[in-house]
């Protein structure tokens, strides 16, 4: 039985912050479902400020009737076929060394904060794949640890990734899942949706758009941090706290807005919304046009509120939604064939060394 080890400095599943967590959890779950032994090492402290999260982790597991073992600040539990381990930041290196020796993984997946050190530590013992979730220093930093593979989540990221000796760069699009049967049946309102309304994601333009279109309902979903106070004065805005299951929101809105000012790698929300028949309007920044394909509306990053308002009014969300759903379905195929094509799956099927 092949063994995969996911090791990083963020929380292990099922605790989500953004797209990187979702992408890796779905990939790990696919490997586990295919018969791999899948181990997921993370931390119960945030890597950016070491804020403690252990209490929240315990509470969540208790609420979901998930048994766990706790010893010497290590928390172990099973989630969707994965063996999950959450430890303090200062123990990641020592626990990783122990896992490399005892579990003897065939492949180690790592990414984000501190991933270069993890890749360098694991490289002598196993095949190492660094997942490139963005073109930021955090997203591309794993490459300095010289992983055997650098898996870019889009062609855009692949083009921006620096070439590194000993690292093969390839595209591995994020995994997605089809909506549950019956989820598509929900009345769609005239409201439009935006996730993570912060400055980098286009909040300034959003404020202008909300004021320019008082007749249009906007639903905003909390993302990286709570910005509800910034939008509290608008009568045409509904602000929703962060939710794990976005399906009801996708199904009940006619458009998703992606007015990012930064170079997003490959926004998961575009594909997720499309799987529910909700098309998107986005800027031409980063990997947004790649995620939209020819089934959404792409506006220049320099476009103002009036141009966005015109696009909202003119969008044929019925036709665009059907086309978007059809295209997005292709992203729900298994990722194991891609790993096989890259030489990762055969390596995992070979005897461990």
Protein language model features and the residues they cover:
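N-terminal strand-loop element at the rim of the active site
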Residues: 10-14, 33-83
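Short His-centered aromatic/hydrophobic patch
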Residues: 88-90, 110-115, 132
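Donor nucleotide-sugar binding/catalytic pocket of nucleotide-sugar-dependent glycosyltransferases
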Residues: 137, 146-182
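Conserved catalytic-core segment of nucleotide-activated headgroup transferases in glycan assembly
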Residues: 178-233, 239
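Short glycine-rich donor-binding/catalytic loop of glycosyltransferases
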Residues: 261, 278, 282-289, 301-303
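A charged, aromatic-enriched C-terminal amphipathic alpha-helix characteristic of glycosyltransferases
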Residues: 303, 316-345
């Amino acid at each position: 039985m092949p063994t995969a080890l996911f090791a990083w400095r963020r929380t292990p599943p099922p605790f989500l912050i953004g797209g990187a967590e979702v992408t890796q959890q779905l990939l790990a779950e696919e490997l586990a479902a295919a018969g791999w032994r899948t181990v997921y090492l993370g931390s119960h402290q945030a890597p950016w400020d070491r804020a403690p999260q252990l209490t929240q982790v315990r509470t969540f597991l208790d609420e979901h009737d998930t048994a766990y073992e706790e010893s010497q600040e290590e928390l172990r539990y099973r989630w969707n076929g994965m063996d999950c381990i959450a430890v303090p930041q200062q123990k990641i290196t020592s626990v990783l060394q122990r896992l490399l020796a005892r579990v003897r993984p065939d492949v180690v997946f790592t990414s984000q904060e501190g991933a270069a050190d993890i890749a360098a530590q694991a490289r002598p013992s196993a095949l190492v794949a660094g997942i490139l979730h963005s073109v930021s220093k955090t997203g591309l930093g794993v490459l300095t640890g010289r992983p055997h593979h650098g898996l870019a989540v889009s062609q855009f990221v692949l083009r921006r990734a620096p070439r590194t000796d000993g690292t093969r760069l390839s595209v591995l699009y994020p995994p997605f899942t089809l909506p549950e049967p019956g989820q598509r049946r929900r009345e769609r309102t005239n409201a439009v949706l935006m996730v993570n309304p912060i400055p980098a994601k286009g909040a300034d333009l959003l404020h202008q758009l909300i004021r320019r279109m008082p007749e249009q309902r906007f639903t905003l979903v909390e993302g990286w941090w709570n910005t509800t106070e910034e939008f509290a004065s608008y009568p045409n805005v509904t602000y929703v706290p962060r939710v794990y299951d976005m399906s009801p929101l996708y199904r009940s809105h006619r458009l998703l807005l992606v007015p990012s000012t930064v170079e997003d790698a490959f926004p998961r929300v575009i594909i997720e919304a499309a799987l529910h028949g909700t098309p998107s309007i986005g800027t031409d920044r980063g990997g947004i046009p790649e995620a939209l394909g020819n089934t959404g509306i792409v506006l220049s990053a320099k476009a103002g509120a009036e141009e966005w308002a015109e696009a909202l009014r003119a969008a044929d969300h019925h036709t665009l939604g059907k086309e978007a759903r059809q295209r997005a379905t292709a992203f729900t195929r298994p990722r194991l064939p891609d790993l096989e094509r890259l030489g990762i799956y055969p390596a995992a099927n070979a005897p461990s060394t």
